């Protein structure tokens, strides 16, 4: 029996890690322009840090506001924004649905993806799949990818500001994953 382990190409974590976004992308050989997908709250919180970090690293970038649902409509909207920008890298910043959308759009465009989670509520940041919903929020499909994200950048200072209920949700998700893994081994 073979065992297989897959993970992001690079995982970076620490207080203030958002300030290292450009440097971490450069270390992986990622290129700009960079399209960042995030919700309103996350944009308000992190846009100044993205601006400084990406400017210092020489990356042109644009921010695209997430609609709130990882749907085929939103994925196509992000892909269109990426094409219009001439994006060479897609960055998702936020919760699981934002990260799933960024991953799906990047895969559809054949681009690398960087995930910057702002909550610790699931294992979505490191995953090689997206959960797709209808525009109304009803589950539609799982979309699997050949590889995990190119970079996962976790700013623990940002994660610590998230609502406690989302951390508790992440603990539940981790526990469920443990039981799933045990079942597979048994």
Where are these regions (language model features)?
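Alpha-helical scaffold segments in soluble metabolic enzymes
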Residues: 20-24, 49, 77, 104, ...
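Glycine-/small-residue-rich active-site loops that bind phosphorylated ligands and cofactors
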Residues: 42, 69-71, 97, 120, ...
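A short, small-residue-rich loop immediately preceding and capping a beta-strand
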Residues: 82-105, 109-120
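A glycine/threonine-rich phosphate-anchoring loop and its flanking beta-alpha core
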Residues: 108-186
